[in-house]
């Protein structure tokens, strides 16, 4: 049987796994699903229409699955999905999607959202990411995998933050952040590769050296994006398969990448 504190308020339409824990003064609303071994510590509100996986931790004063802050929203049935092994610290706000963009906000697995992080409607967040204190993620943003976003940073609507990148503290991101890059400033500018992140993943020196070459081609050579892509594909991709991540970033970007 689930461990539910007597002061918690649970909707009859909520589904809570028998191994989950619902702490004091939590509220679990309509059509909420909470998976195995997930813990709502205390004073957590899961408003409605939210699916939460296994082994997640939610800390006090978090607001989960609230209506989107979008003037077009008119009460449609939209959803928030949260995967497994995530830690959501104090006072985070995670909003559901809007009908105009698929009706879903989605957070993957093994993410750490630190104090007062906001994830707006229709965002898609992958796996193994860290969003530090007071990060604001506007609507329709895509954040990939293995990314760190420094505290007090803001990410503009519709931007993409690609895999293995690093956003420095107090950064304003107005364009897409290419894979592997390190950006900071207001507005954000590229300041090299996320070398320390690569080393922590155990990547070889040879792989990192090829990625350094790729960075210089794209960001420091003066070539157009089309010209840089040709060099990456013809000269560097045969040497290192991870170059494909950078190629993909450049090809799919609609806002242009931070340079």
UniProtKB/Swiss-Prot annotation:
Signal peptide range: none
Main enzyme class: transferase
Catalytic reaction equation(s): a (3R)-hydroxyacyl-[ACP] + UDP-N-acetyl-alpha-D-glucosamine = a UDP-3-O-[(3R)-3-hydroxyacyl]-N-acetyl-alpha-D-glucosamine + holo-[ACP]
Gene3D superfamilies: Hexapeptide repeat proteins, Udp N-acetylglucosamine O-acyltransferase, C-terminal domain
Record's keyword terms, sorted: Acyltransferase, Cytoplasm, Lipid A biosynthesis, Lipid biosynthesis, Lipid metabolism, Repeat, Transferase
InterPro entries per UniProt: Acetyltransf_C (IPR029098), Acetyltransf_C_sf (IPR037157), Hexapep (IPR001451), Hexapep_transf_CS (IPR018357), Lipid_A_LpxA (IPR010137), Trimer_LpxA-like_sf (IPR011004)
Gene Ontology CC: cytoplasm; membrane
Metabolic or biological pathway: Glycolipid biosynthesis; lipid IV(A) biosynthesis; lipid IV(A) from (3R)-3-hydroxytetradecanoyl-[acyl-carrier-protein] and UDP-N-acetyl-alpha-D-glucosamine: step 1/6
GO molecular function: acyl-[acyl-carrier-protein]-UDP-N-acetylglucosamine O-acyltransferase activity
GO biological process per UniProt: lipid A biosynthetic process
UniProt main location, coarse: cytoplasm
EC number assigned by the record: 2.3.1.129
Subcellular location: Cytoplasm
Role this protein plays: Involved in the biosynthesis of lipid A, a phosphorylated glycolipid that anchors the lipopolysaccharide to the outer membrane of the cell.
Self-association and partners: Homotrimer.
HAMAP family: LpxA
Record-stated family: Belongs to the transferase hexapeptide repeat family. LpxA subfamily.
Protein name: Acyl-[acyl-carrier-protein]--UDP-N-acetylglucosamine O-acyltransferase
Organism, scientific name: Psychrobacter cryohalolentis (strain ATCC BAA-1226 / DSM 17306 / VKM B-2378 / K5)
């Amino acid at each position: 049987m689930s461990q539910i504190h007597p002061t918690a308020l649970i909707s009859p339409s909520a589904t809570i796994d028998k191994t989950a824990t619902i702490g004091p003064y939590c509220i679990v609303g309509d059509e909420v699903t909470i998976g195995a071994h997930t813990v709502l510590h205390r004073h957590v509100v899961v408003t409605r229409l939210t699916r939460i996986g296994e082994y997640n931790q939610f800390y006090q004063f978090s607001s989960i699955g609230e209506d989107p802050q979008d003037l077009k929203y008119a009460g449609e049935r939209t959803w928030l999905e949260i995967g497994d092994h995530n830690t959501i610290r104090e006072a985070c706000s995670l909003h559901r999607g809007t009908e105009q963009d698929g009706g879903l906000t989605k957070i993957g697995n093994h993410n750490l959202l630190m104090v007062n992080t906001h994830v707006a409607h229709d965002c898609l967040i992958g796996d193994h990411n860290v969003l530090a204190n007071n990060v604001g993620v506007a609507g329709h943003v895509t954040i990939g995998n293995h990314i760190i976003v420094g505290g007090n940073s803001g990410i503009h609507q519709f931007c993409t933050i690609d895999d293995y990148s690093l956003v420095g503290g107090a950064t304003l991101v107005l364009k897409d952040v290419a894979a592997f890059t390190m950006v900071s400033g207001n507005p954000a500018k590229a300041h090299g590769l996320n070398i320390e992140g690569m080393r922590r993943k155990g990547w070889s020196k040879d792989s990192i050296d090829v990625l350094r070459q790729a960075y210089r081609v794209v960001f420091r050579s003066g070539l157009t994006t089309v010209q840089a892509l040709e060099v990456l594909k013809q000269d560097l991709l045969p040497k290192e398969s991870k170059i494909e991540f950078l190629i993909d970033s450049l090809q799919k970007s609609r806002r242009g990448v931070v340079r």
